[in-house]
Amino acid sequence: MSNKLGNIPQIKLGLVAVSRNCFPMSLSEKRRDAVAAAYAEKYDREELFVCPTIIENELDMRKALGEVNAAGCNALVVYLGNFGPETPETLLAKYFDGPAMYVAAAEDDCGDALIDDRGDAYCGMLNASYNLKLRGVKAYRPEYPVGTAPEVADMIKEFIPIARAVVGLGNLKLITFGPRPQDFLACNAPIARLYDLGVEIEENSELDLYAAYHDHDGDERIPALVEEMAAELGAGNKMAGILPRLAQYELTLTDWA
């Protein structure tokens, strides 16, 4: 069945590396590129935009934010290539209009970049998580968010359906019908958590729905919609006589203002 309403968001991820200024920026850059290469090898490279700016400070953060927005990214992967600067790396998720995930680099061979090859971002991930909590910024972190380049690539892929759900819900509007007048939101349903997800809710009168349904009596679009429904049902079309009424009801809802 085709997705006629286009209501399944396509996710484009922005991969943004961060670096604390007491570490060489090249370490985060090298590790970011390794993650991007691992992702391209295992998955669809077109899903991932590699942000050219590496964030060390707030000015970098604003530049990177502009770059991911210009690239059309609707989800963010903040990658701690080393310990990471807590303020700008968490402000990025605060100002980005979409879901964000935080992941970090495990220890690897840093070559001449660091003494004793130390360079994992485990401690930085702990501090980033603490800072996100202090700011009240919601961001996804995998159960174990520190890994090698291939492991981080897998984490990014696993984030896509989560990001898709968040983006989809954030653009969702529920139009409900009840016994009260139009847009009279006095229901006792537990809607607070829906608001937390960015979902909008508008309650309308059942009497208005009834009137709108009959406004579509004899609608010229009904026969074509009935044919489409019958084709979708195929052998499962056991109650063909009800399809005109269902088509009229569907048109009533899709025309709802």
Where are these regions (language model features)?
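An N-terminal assembly and electron-transfer interface module characteristic of large anaerobic redox
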Residues: 1-257
